[in-house]
Amino acid sequence: MSIDFRNLNTLWGSILVETLARLGLKIGVVSPGSRSTPLTIALARHPQIEAIPILDERSAAFFALGLAKQLYQPVVLVCTSGTATANFYPAVIEAKESHVPLLILTADRPPELRHAHAGQTIDQVKLYGNYPNWQAEISCPSANIERLRYLRQTIIHAWWRCLDPVPGVVHLNLPFRDPLAPTPDLEINNLEANFDQEAFFSHISRQNIAINHSILQINSLPSKGIIIAGLASPQNPESYCQAIADLARSQQYPILAEALSPLRNYAGLNPHLITTYDLLLRNPALRTQLTPDVVLQIGELPTSKELRTWLEEIDCPRWIIDPHPDNYDPLQGKTGHLRVNIEQLGDLFPDKTDNNREYRQLWQKFDQQARLTIDRLLAAETKLIEGKIPWLLSQYLPPRTPIFISNSMPVRYAEFFNPPSDRQIRPYFNRGANGIDGNLSTAIGIAYKNVPSLLLTGDLALLHDTNGFLIKKYFVGSLTIILINNKGGGIFQMLPIAKFDPPFEEFFATPQNIDFCQLCRTYGIDYHLISDWTDFEQKIAVLPESGIRLLEISCDRAFNTQWFLSNYV
């Protein structure tokens, strides 16, 4: 793209955006506003960058988060000055906690208009606290080549800080003086005449710097161990699953795989898979019988409270394998961290194919028995209950479907009931901060220009983010929303507070009594109320090629809780 020399602000904006384009930026998400005009114009006119306007900043930020999860590279997020910037905050927190690269560009008033009650002006410097990987304020635009070089190099640094050493958020605050519109300014003509665009950008590379990992050398592991594969959304799920399968085979260890890990969807790669660990560990005798001598934990711990409590009880040595510098041990156990990708583990652990196979086979025997019980129970259930939904999704969804699983009960039912399969379903999630805000917008971002995708969510999580439906105007792709409508917060029904009503129903369950058919009509969303399981199976077996569709499953919250407590716990 040619640099825009119409005035100082268009020059500044186009240098910034051209630098990002050469670094590999594909998409910019823009919320409307006046102060951000130079950034908006530069993004909108660049032929290699897709600029998407999203009205609501909070929704825009989660949409960008979803895009970045799908693309595995930074997405730019732009807004005007003032409180608009604060609406990015929830997504900033989630991006930081889940290591998603976002480059946030907040426009601002120039310094002389701050602290003087100028309109739409707040203190935006370091607005997001300690959540960004890096943050800085760019100087006001200036028409000299040294300042343009400064801008270019700062943007290059910001891009790589989004990715290295850990993916996350970078915040740049950019003040602009008037005129914000691209009105001509003849004073910068001399700079244009002496500007060599190709020479100016020639050194920019899309190749990241190499990262060196300090790896602890381990001579041997105990023969009686387990691998715990926590939530993960790797760019190449097959190689990720293969690396864990190779480790399991070399050590003869069973793998306890979370539903938010791709392992359950690549079961053919791994005959050592255990998926019913939550149910098995509710049995006091098995908790003792299945105690290992060592645990290899891949990434974060699974959601299961039973598993976490058991690990606290046994307190055996645990190696946490993950490249990020975070502490992934909320249990404060006997842990050591190996800061390396599982795919790079190689021969760190010597082959122990003669290890204690009886221990691994014991896990597999109990897992097969528990799986048979769960499958029979769910297959026989004709009433619409929440737990059967993820169980059927894992069997009927088209292969390789991306599925965003909302927080609260959907992630837990997936962990409890999802069977292993070879359908290569790709799970996505916002488990960095585990909130229910922004789930719809994130799912739309994941589905954008992707294969037909799916969102599994509860009613309260969906209602938290109905502004996400405004993205429909610009949405390209297919998203099917599975709405579990239990008229309130189902997770609270499982807690002791449920026995105290009042105030339980009004202040904890908080039913909203929304007509979702009417809500969908408002936004032009295709709606269908599921009548029975056959209807549901037919609707999810073939996903639409385009558009947004909502399938509502109405569940009785009290009955569902009673079913779970009677049949599972």
Curated annotation (Swiss-Prot):
Which cofactors go with this protein?
A: Mg(2+); Mn(2+); thiamine diphosphate
Q: Name one GO molecular function term.
A: magnesium ion binding
Which CDD domains does the protein's record reference?
Answer: TPP_PYR_MenD, TPP_SHCHC_synthase
Q: Gene3D superfamilies in the record, alphabetically?
A: 3.40.50.970, TPP-binding domain
Pathway listed for it is: Quinol/quinone metabolism; 1,4-dihydroxy-2-naphthoate biosynthesis; 1,4-dihydroxy-2-naphthoate from chorismate: step 2/7; Cofactor biosynthesis; phylloquinone biosynthesis
What sections of the protein cross the membrane?
none
Q: What class of enzyme is it?
A: transferase
Which terms does the UniProt entry file under GO BP? Answer: menaquinone biosynthetic process; phylloquinone biosynthetic process
Top-rank taxon: Bacteria
Cofactor: record remark: Binds 1 thiamine pyrophosphate per subunit.
EC number(s): the record gives 2.2.1.9
Stored InterPro entries = MenaQ_synth_MenD, MenD_middle, THDP-binding, Thiamin_PyroP_enz_TPP-bd_dom
Reactions it catalyzes? isochorismate + 2-oxoglutarate + H(+) = 5-enolpyruvoyl-6-hydroxy-2-succinyl-cyclohex-3-ene-1-carboxylate + CO2
Q: Which UniProt keywords apply?
A: Magnesium, Manganese, Metal-binding, Thiamine pyrophosphate, Transferase
Which stretches are annotated as coiled coil?
A: none
Share what the entry says about its subunit structure, partners included: Homodimer.
User: What family name appears in the similarity comment?
Assistant: Belongs to the TPP enzyme family. MenD subfamily.
The free-text function statement in the UniProt record for this protein reads:
Catalyzes the thiamine diphosphate-dependent decarboxylation of 2-oxoglutarate and the subsequent addition of the resulting succinic semialdehyde-thiamine pyrophosphate anion to isochorismate to yield 2-succinyl-5-enolpyruvyl-6-hydroxy-3-cyclohexene-1-carboxylate (SEPHCHC).
Q: What HAMAP family does the record point to? A: MenD
| Protein name per UniProt | 2-succinyl-5-enolpyruvyl-6-hydroxy-3-cyclohexene-1-carboxylate synthase
